[in-house]
Amino acid sequence: IKTLNSKFYSSTNEYLKNTIKELNKNTFDIVEVHNRPNMINELIEKVNSKYVLYLHNDPRSMKGTKTPKERLNLLSKVDKIIFITKWVKNKFFEDLNLDSNHYKCEIIYHSIEKERKILKKEKKIVFVGKLNESKGYDIFCDATKKLLDSHKNWKAYSIGDEKRIKTYSTHPRHIVLGYMPNKKVLTFLNKSEIAVIPSRWEEPFGRTALEASSRGCATIISDRGGLPETTDEAIILEKLNAKTLKNKIENLIVNTKLRKIIQSK
C-alpha cells in the first residue's frame, strides 16, 4: 500500500476516507492502527480484516478512548490492543470493571540494540529532550548550575529545542547544543558519563532513558508515567527537584565504582 500524503494534518476525515479506499484495493489479514482509536469503528465497518490497535499515549486523552464506555466498546470490536507500557495499559483499564489481564491485551515495549562498543567516556552530563518545564529542563539547569562549581572537570550539555523557549539561568559550562538527528544523539550519549531525564509530565514510555542506558550512560530518571519501565538500571528520583537531582548526579561523579557498575549493566 502506498504512503498517503499528509492529508491527516489538514483533515482527519479526508485521511480516513483515503485510507479506507487504499485498504479496499488490497486484501490484508491484519490492519494495525497506531494511536487513532477514533478511526476504528469506521474502519471495521468498511474494511474486512482483523484489527490490532497500538496505544502509545494515555488513552484517556485520546479521541475514541476518553470515556470508560468508549474503551469498552473498542475492546469489544478490535482483535488485539497493544500497549507500550504497563502504565498506558493501566490508564486504559482505569474505571473499567474488568481485569486488566484481558486476553485481547498485551504489553510490547519499545526496544533498541545495546551498543557493544562503548566509546571512551567523557565527563559530560547530558539532557536530551524539549527544553521546557514539562520535561524538567529547569530542574536540570538549576541542579547543574549548583553542581559544576564544585566539579571543575565536568560539563553539562542540553540537546533539543523548544519553539516557545524560555530563558533559563545556566552555568557557563552548560552548553546548549540545540536539535540533533537521532544518530548523532546516540553517538553523543555513547561518549557521555551521565544522562538525566527529570520529566514532570507522565511519560507514556520515555525513549531517551532507553537510549541512554543502551549507550552505557549512568542514567537518572523521574518516576513519572512509564519512565521506570524503560530501564532496570536507572536511578529513580524520589523527589523531583533540583536539590535531589544535584545530589544524585554528585553521588555518581564522586563514586566512580557505582557509576561504572550502572554503565556496564
What are the roles of these predicted feature ranges?
Residues I165-K183:
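Nucleotide-activated donor-binding/catalytic signature segment of Leloir-type glycosyltransferases, i.e.
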Residues A234-K243, N251-T256:
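Conserved acidic donor-binding segment of nucleotide-sugar-dependent glycosyltransferases
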Residues V33-N38, L55:
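Short His-centered aromatic/hydrophobic patch
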Residues N190-P204, C217:
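Acidic donor-binding loop of glycosyltransferase active sites
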Residues D58-P59, W87-V88, I107-R116, K163:
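Short beta-strand->alpha-helix junction loop in the catalytic core
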Residues I82, I118-K135, C141-K145:
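Conserved donor-binding/catalytic core segment of Leloir-type glycosyltransferases
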Residues G64, R71-L72, S76-Y103:
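A short, active-site helix/loop in glycosyltransferases that binds the activated sugar's phosphate group
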Residues T167, R224-I236:
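Short acidic/histidine- and often glycine-rich active-site loop of Leloir-type glycosyltransferases
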